[in-house]
Structure formats: structure tokens, C-alpha cells
Amino acid sequence: MGCVHSTGSEAKKRSQLIDAQLRLEHDQCGTEVKLLLLGAGESGKSTIVRQMRILHVIGFSKQEKLAYRAVIYSNMIQSMLVIIRVMKALGIDFENSAHKEDAHQFSSHYLHIHNADLSEAFSLELSDLMKNLWSDAGVRRCFKRSREFQLNDSTEYYFNSLDRISETTYLPTQDDILRARVKSTGIVETDFMYKDIYFRMFDVGGQRSERKKWIHCFEGVTAVIFCVALSEYDMKLAEDKIMNRMHESMQLFDSIVNNRWFTETSMILFLNKMDIFEEKIRHIPLNICFPEYKGGTSVTETSNYIRSVFEKLNKRKSTAQKEVYSHFTCATDTNNIRFVFDAVTDIIIRYNLKDCGLF
């Protein structure tokens, strides 16, 4: 099973029982689909995997939720530390001078904290410090410039829920878990049944250092789902401060869609983080990434342009050898992913399983 955060004997036993049931159903069905999730770092691949667990497995156990609680605490602490550091670098002052001391206390106490130290609820002191800081207009001004530095997409969501998350009995909701940021390392497999098909989904780390592992997953792939973060058209890579993230995704997609390993493989493009893109495109023009773009500023026109740019990278389209099936997605929206994955499954059945006697 693709459970990254399971801990304890109960969770292990539970996972083994699910795996056994899936194998039994697979033996009865006889149809197996291998899905490979690829894309640059922070494109939303791991969130898609969590949605598959919610939609097609059994969600998350209490132990897993507790593990995610520590991740969420860490995300929030790291986000605030980043904002404090960047405020100094950008010369942004706290509107309330008392909050400068709050920032000093926060940084000195929690700069070196690790996930292992976050099994308990936020202390009252820490919660109050974060509330004070998040309420400061200077902090908000810095946050609004987050495209200039590396900050989790979930920062605003979590801090706007700080009262709830600070409760001693806090247990992450489904939405909280979907927004948790965990860097993918290695290869994580998630198995599930859907429409009488046994799916094996592989999530592979998207950072440059992780991509050398991709080749080990290429054999026998039924379909590739390539994730692109639409919202990153104006941002730089964490690993390369010069490289535009969208351009990096384009280069990566070019190398995948035209790869000899995938000549007979369905290629599905998820243009993800549509919700963030819709907000950002109102303020930041698309030609910051594509200088040649002369179209309008509407969400529809700009997103369709990005889709066309990626689809044109498919060099086999002109010979009718390979079609790229594109979908606009919001990986944190369960209803959206339910609808999109249903369409994806139909594509896979129609174009990749004809020889398996399904229809």
C-alpha cells in the first residue's frame, strides 16, 4: 500500500489486510493497470495519491492522522520561519513593533525543531506567537510576495485555521491532510480497485535529485500521469534560482512524452493547481513566463494557452501515434479529482486494455 506515514503495529496489520484483499480481488479480476505519476517537485503528485486513498481505499486511520498532524505543525512552523527571514531580507518592517520581539522569540525557540518533536499539540505560547505574527500587516505584505521565495501553498489555509489547529484535541481533517507538504523521496506505491481494475499507482519524487530513480519504473507502464503546477509560471526552482518552474516542467514533459519507453503508453497531462492559478493570473501576467503570449488575461484563455504549449511538445501527434489527454485539475478538490480520474480510467480502458478482453 502507498501509506507514507503509517506507524505502529495496528496500522501495519491494517495495511497488510487491505493488501491481501486487493490481491484477492486482482486475482479474480485479472486486469492490472500500472500508473506512473511524474512531474517536477511540488506539482501535486502526492496530493493525487492521497485523493486515491480517500476515493478508492479507506482514507486515513487515526494513527496516520496523528502523523500528519506533526507534518502540518512542521509546515506551519517552517512557513513562519521563512516569512520572518524573508521580511528581513526584503526590508519589510512589522507594523506592530511588539511583533518584532514575537518573531525573535519564535525563531530562537523553534529554528531547529524537527517532526519528531511535534507529536504533541502546539503550546499556548507558540500558538499565541503565531497568531500575533499572522495578524501583522507586515507579515501579510511579505506573504503576498511569496512568488519571490519558496513558501508552501498551504500557508494561508493553515494560518487562517490556527485556532482550530491549536486545539489540544486537534486531529487533521481530510482537507488538512490533502494540503500537507511532504517532500516525495524514492518511489511510493498505492494499490486500489476501481471499475473492476486493479490499479498500481507509483509516485516518484519530482526534485532533480530524485529523477534518476524514474527509469526503474518505466517498464510495463499502462499510463503516465504527468502533473504540472499551472500556478508556478512566475516562480523559480528551489534547486535552481534562475530556472523558471514552468520552463523546467516543459523540458521534463518533453523528455517524457517523446521517450521511447512510452511509445505505446497513454499520456495524461494534469494541469494542476487551477485554484491558485485563477487567483494569481488576475495580478501577474502570463507573459512573465511566455513573452510571446499576446492573448487576453482571462483564466480560460491563459490556461488554454499553457495547455497548447505542452501539447505541442508531443512530437508523435502529427503521425497519430500518440495523443496527450489533458485535464485541468485542483488536486485538493476531491470532487474534481473524482470526476477527472473517472475520465482517465475510461481513457485507459478504451485505448490501453483492448487486448485484455475487457470489452
Curated annotation (Swiss-Prot):
It comes from the Eukaryota. Residues 31-359 form the G-alpha domain. Residues 329-334 are annotated as: G5 motif. One of its GO terms (biological process) is adenylate cyclase-modulating G protein-coupled receptor signaling pathway. GO terms for cellular component: cytoplasm; heterotrimeric G-protein complex; non-motile cilium. Residues 268-275 are annotated as: G4 motif. One of its GO terms (molecular function) is GTP binding. Pfam families: G-alpha. PROSITE patterns: G_ALPHA. InterPro entries: Gprotein_alpha_I, Gprotein_alpha_su, GproteinA_insert, P-loop_NTPase. Residues 199-208 are annotated as: G3 motif. Residues 34-47 are annotated as: G1 motif. SMART domains: G_alpha. A lipid is attached at residue 2 (N-myristoyl glycine). GTP binds at residues 39-46, 178-184, 203-207, 272-275, 331. The keyword Metal-binding applies. Keywords: GTP-binding, Lipoprotein, Magnesium, Metal-binding, Myristate, Nucleotide-binding, Palmitate, Transducer. The keyword Magnesium applies. Signal peptide: none annotated. A lipid is attached at residue 3 (S-palmitoyl cysteine). Residues 176-184 are annotated as: G2 motif. Belongs to the G-alpha family. G(i/o/t/z) subfamily. G proteins are composed of 3 units; alpha, beta and gamma. The alpha chain contains the guanine nucleotide binding site. Guanine nucleotide-binding proteins (G proteins) are involved as modulators or transducers in various transmembrane signaling systems. This is Guanine nucleotide-binding protein alpha-4 subunit. It comes from Caenorhabditis briggsae. The lineage of its organism: Eukaryota, Metazoa, Ecdysozoa, Nematoda, Chromadorea.
